[in-house]
Curated annotation (Swiss-Prot):
Gene that encodes it: atpG
Name of this chain's protein: ATP synthase gamma chain
Signal peptide range: none
Family, similarity comment: Belongs to the ATPase gamma chain family.
Coiled-coil residue spans: none
Molecular-function annotations in GO: ATP binding; proton-transporting ATP synthase activity, rotational mechanism
Function: Produces ATP from ADP in the presence of a proton gradient across the membrane. The gamma chain is believed to be important in regulating ATPase activity and the flow of protons through the CF(0) complex.
Keywords in alphabetical order: ATP synthesis, Cell inner membrane, Cell membrane, CF(1), Hydrogen ion transport, Ion transport, Membrane, Transport
Native source species: Campylobacter jejuni (strain RM1221)
A biological-process GO annotation: proton motive force-driven plasma membrane ATP synthesis
Length: 294
């Protein structure tokens, strides 16, 4: 009888877990739809800015005639890289499968790679998971940002990227790289590594088939465009990461719900078998008692 009570207790416990994971799956699905729409809208805008600034990087000398202009450094890779700033995004919350693992593994590998080349790498961490991971590894973080990956904010994104750009312009770092696990589709996330600064041309073909004409008076436009480019790339990465996080959590909770269903089914079979054995044992005892009284 005690065995039956224990199995029944387990069934109730797993069933409650199933309800919780299913509810979390539904919440993640609803949030994913909103995040997916926001990511798609932002991607179109970010890509267009990226295309324009990439084209400008081919024709930068037409705009900026002073070789000492600090803006030129944003378009030219330094011959010797001594310091690299790495901005990476992880989730603030758990229960999202292997979503954070890809990013943390990549950042760890990049750390080893740059250290092997005697290049100093400085980490700017966005998201509680990544911050706690590297704190546990006793690896110093230059900047820590909580609650930004779960609630993307444009002004906060600007604060993050402005600090990195200022460090680059002041000579404190030679390159800025942005790493995050992005949204590909409902069931797939895609690790993205964006070499943000210096700005590099994405396609040489653009120099041959350019429809963009630039004038010397375009220096003000260039400055505004660069500012928007850096800010929006940072903001888009946050939105893209959040959509991927909801996608990963939806999958993780769906798997957990299915596993709970399978476990309940197994426990029900075990309960019925144990109950049948208990009834059989009782019948045998009754029959034996009757026989002994004859």
């Amino acid at each position: 009888m005690s065995n039956l009570k224990e199995i029944k207790r387990k069934i109730k416990s797993v069933h409650n877990t199933q309800k919780t994971t299913n509810a979390m799956k539904l919440v993640s699905t609803a949030k994913l739809k909103k995040a997916e729409e926001a990511a798609k809208r932002s991607k179109i805008y970010a890509q267009k800015i990226d295309e324009i600034l990439s084209e400008i990087s081919f024709q930068i000398n037409k705009i900026v005639h002073n070789e000492d202009d600090v803006r030129l450094s944003l378009f030219h890779k330094k011959e010797q890289i001594k310091t690299v700033d790495l901005i990476f995004i992880t989730a603030d919350k758990g229960l999202c499968g292997g979503f954070n693992i890809k990013t943390l593994k990549t950042v760890s590998e990049m750390l080893k790679e740059y250290e092997a080349k005697n290049i100093n790498i400085r980490l700017r961490a966005i998201g509680k998971t990544g911050i706690e991971y590297f704190n546990f590894q006793k690896i110093e973080l230059l900047e820590k940002y909580f609650h930004l990956s779960s609630s993307p904010d444009y002004e906060k994104a600007c604060e993050v990227i402005h600090a990195a750009v200022d460090d680059f312009l002041n000579g404190n770092t030679d390159e800025v790289i942005l790493v995050h696990n992005g949204y590909k589709n409902m069931i797939t996330q895609e690790l993205k590594i964006n070499h943000l600064i210096p700005v590099e041309p994405k396609s040489i073909e653009q120099t041959h088939n350019s429809l963009l004409e630039l004038e010397p008076e375009g220096t003000e436009l260039l400055e505004d465009l660069m500012k928007t480019y850096f800010e929006y790339n940072m903001y888009y990465a946050l939105i893209d990461s959040l959509a991927a996080e909801h996608s990963a959590r939806m999958q993780a909770m769906d798997n957990a719900t299915n596993n709970a269903k399978a476990r309940v089914k197994q426990l029900n079979l075990a309960y019925n078998k144990a109950r049948q054995e208990s009834i059989t044992t009782e019948l045998i005892e009754i029959i034996s008692g009757v026989e002994s009284m004859k």
